[in-house]
């Protein structure tokens, strides 16, 4: 029991469970005895009915639309805390990770487009390598233990949070279907209620979650991706402490283990099951997977390192205390672990086009993320062991 408690208390545990979930999905999707069960599980219909309201989705879509909204709620809470009290609370503190994140989104997207611009279908996946998997990246960093400077961990956390915020904006602007004005009106009303609750000082988290459920349903029906509702709710839950209690921090504390040990692993299990049947060298070297691998493995560290260098060169920001530029480059490589966030964007980009494209995209994401994890870990380990 003591060893189990120590495992779940470590920062690496979430990343390790993600790896196990993804490996299990790959195994089950490619074994004759289990592949049928795996796909049947994902296609299981689940119906929710409340009065006249009815939502019919298969298990995969419930995981991607509903459970991932809880993940984005946690992201919203973390972003709000960092903006108001943490590493993004002042312009001077925020400048370096913000500039790094911008470079880490622009360059991978451009590199992907260099491979896929001529194909109007695969071109839609330009945002896939722009994302970073916070849990996985922090998990790999945690494998190096106390040798990693605290400032470097905070930098990676801040960079990944801004990265996810950028991914949220990209999803809202570029990956929405036909919009329902009525549903958007209901969503706007729900947001107004959340704002009113916050202004009136309502501190009961359950009230925000209840209104958030209405918002999620309205956003789902509107054509905008439903997970965005989670971020919005997170922004409105009060952060300020009263009698030593903060509703936002308390909810963040409650949600974190559920997200790390259930929701993200379940998402990985549901989405990482790529069939290797029919995989050929020609397929692996086609523009879609190559663009994703290049974007994650080369574009991410190149964009982050280049923009950080420019920020330092023109004195727009400074290195986090106790870190070196070589260590920042290593963190840039780790940010190429797109995994869950990249798979999520791939499902939005190609979900209504061709299942084969999603399969190739996932394969590219898995290869690019794995290579980024191995190279980033090795590079940072060498930099930490190097004499100052």
UniProtKB/Swiss-Prot annotation:
Reaction catalyzed: Na(+)(in) + 2 H(+)(out) = Na(+)(out) + 2 H(+)(in)
UniProtKB keywords: Antiport, Cell inner membrane, Cell membrane, Ion transport, Membrane, Sodium, Sodium transport, Transmembrane, Transmembrane helix, Transport
Membrane topology (UniProt): Multi-pass membrane protein
Gene Ontology CC: one annotated term: plasma membrane
InterPro entries: Na/H_antiporter_dom_sf, NhaA
Segments traversing the membrane: 14-34, 59-79, 95-115, 125-145, 154-174, 179-199, 219-239, 254-274, 292-312, 328-348, 360-380
Keyword DNA-binding: no
An annotated Gene Ontology molecular function: sodium:proton antiporter activity
Domain of life: Bacteria
GO aspect biological process, one term: regulation of pH
Subcellular location: Cell inner membrane
HAMAP family (alphabetical): NhaA
Function: Na(+)/H(+) antiporter that extrudes sodium in exchange for external protons.
Family membership noted in the UniProt record: Belongs to the NhaA Na(+)/H(+) (TC 2.A.33) antiporter family.
NCBIfam families documented for this protein: NhaA, PRK09560.1, PRK09561.1
PANTHER family listed in its UniProt record: NA(+)_H(+) ANTIPORTER NHAA, SODIUM ION/PROTON ANTIPORTER NHAA-RELATED
Protein name according to UniProt: Na(+)/H(+) antiporter NhaA
Source organism (scientific name): Salmonella typhimurium (strain LT2 / SGSC1412 / ATCC 700720)
């Amino acid at each position: 029991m003591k060893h189990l408690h120590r495992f779940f208390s470590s920062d690496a545990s979430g990343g390790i469970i993600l790896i196990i979930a993804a490996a299990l999905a790959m195994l089950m999707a490619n074994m004759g005895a289990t592949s049928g069960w795996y796909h049947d599980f994902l296609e299981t219909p689940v119906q929710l009915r409340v009065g006249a309201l009815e939502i019919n989705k298969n298990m995969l879509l419930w995981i991607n639309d509903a459970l991932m909204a809880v993940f984005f709620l946690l992201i919203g809470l973390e972003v709000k805390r960092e903006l108001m009290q943490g590493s993004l609370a002042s312009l001077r503190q925020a400048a370096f990770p913000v500039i790094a994140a911008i470079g880490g989104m622009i360059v991978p997207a451009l590199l992907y487009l260099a491979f896929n611009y001529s194909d109007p279908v695969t071109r839609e996946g330009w945002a896939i390598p722009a994302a970073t998997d916070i849990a996985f990246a922090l998990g790999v960093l945690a494998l190096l233990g106390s040798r990693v400077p605290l400032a470097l961990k905070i930098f990676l956390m801040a960079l990944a949070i801004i990265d996810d915020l950028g991914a949220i904006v990209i999803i809202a602007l570029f990956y929405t279907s036909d919009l329902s004005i009525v549903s958007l009106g209901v969503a706007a009303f729900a947001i107004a209620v959340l704002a009113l609750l916050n202004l009136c000082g309502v501190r009961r988290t359950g009230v925000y979650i209840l209104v958030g459920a209405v918002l999620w349903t309205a956003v789902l029906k509107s054509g905008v991706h439903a997970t965005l509702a989670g971020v919005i709710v997170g922004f409105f839950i009060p952060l300020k402490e009263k009698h030593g209690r903060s509703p936002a921090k308390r909810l963040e504390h409650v949600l974190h283990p559920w997200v790390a040990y259930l929701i993200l692993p379940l998402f990985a299990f549901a989405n990482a099951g790529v069939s290797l049947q029919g995989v050929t060298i020609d397929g692996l070297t086609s523009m879609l997977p190559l663009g994703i691998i290049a974007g994650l493995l080369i574009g991410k560290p190149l964009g982050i390192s280049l923009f950080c260098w420019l920020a330092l060169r023109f004195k727009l920001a400074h290195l986090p205390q106790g870190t070196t530029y070589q260590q920042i480059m290593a963190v840039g490589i780790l940010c190429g672990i797109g995994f869950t966030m990249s798979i999520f964007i791939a499902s939005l980009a190609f979900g209504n086009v061709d299942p084969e494209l999603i399969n190739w995209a996932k394969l590219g994401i898995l290869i690019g993320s794995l290579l980024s994890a191995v190279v980033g870990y090795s590079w940072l380990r060498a930099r930490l062991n190097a004499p100052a």
